[in-house]
Amino acid sequence: SELKDIIAAVTPCKGADFELQALKIRQPQGDEVLVKXXATGM
């Protein structure tokens, strides 16, 4: 699968502070879901 550069909000656990990281991941396959979030006011 082709890898894409994705900017993702990474957090160690629910409710924790998150940091934006550039991740190299593949496109979702089958029933996988890639969640995209847009951050505002940053």
From Swiss-Prot:
The keyword Oxidoreductase applies. This is Aryl-alcohol dehydrogenase. It catalyses: an aromatic primary alcohol + NAD(+) = an aromatic aldehyde + NADH + H(+). Homodimer. Its EC number is 1.1.1.90. It comes from Acinetobacter guillouiae. Binds 2 Zn(2+) ions per subunit. It comes from the Bacteria. GO terms for molecular function: aryl-alcohol dehydrogenase (NAD+) activity; metal ion binding. InterPro entries: GroES-like_sf (IPR011032).
